[in-house]
Amino acid sequence: MILINIRSMIKKLNLLLLTLLFVSCVDDDPVLEPIEAMIVTNLEAKTTSQPGQPLSGDFVKFSFEKQTVVEGDDWDIAFRATTILVNGGFAAADDEPSRTGIAAGYVAVGAYGSINNVDESLLKQDSETAYAVPTGSGNGWYNYEGPPTHLITPIAGRTLIFKTHNGRYAKMEIQSYYKDAPESPNAFTDEAQVYTFNYTYQPNEGVISFD
């Protein structure tokens, strides 16, 4: 004679189902890629125009993911002199690269290390009338000191926040506008239009934290 304890079997089945559900949930948790903190030195963003003439020259396109200058459409930001473009929105001039991505940006007021999250409500793309990173002394990332020094210096406590061309995020702190990032730059003797900057790249889609 075989006796079957139905209640005991139901308990065991429920326990098995709960175990399988837990294992399934654990397996479904995404494995996040590590956040990357990088330093870029001596990135040249030269103009070809003479002083007093309208700016000309190619924009230098940069990829946060690839950690280097790129030639294709997979760029996130682009530099020429003090101007920084994002790969999203519309061009303001014919000599700018086409915007093919969904990049955006804004200038955050706060020390680089204290900016731990992206405020998505502040993100803007480039347009025909304005850039996501404002141009002009005191408006975006730099001050122009004028005569007699004519120095261009990063504004302390300004952090650039970017959405990349494919929807990831990065924050950037510009350290210097002069070659080799001299502690006391001289606009007459140090080579200008050469960037040194730090950046932190969040490679995981939909994650807005830099922690």
What are these regions, as identified by a protein language model?
Residues 1-9:
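N-terminal secretory signal peptides that target proteins for export/translocation
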Residues 10-18:
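Sec-dependent signal peptide recognition
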Residues 21-24:
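C-terminal motif of bacterial Sec signal peptides marking the signal peptidase cleavage site
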Residues 26-158, 180-184, 190-211:
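N-terminal "domain-start" segment
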Residues 160-164:
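A short beta-strand micro-motif
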Residues 165-169:
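Glycine-centered tight beta-turn/hairpin loop motif at sheet-sheet or coil-to-beta transitions
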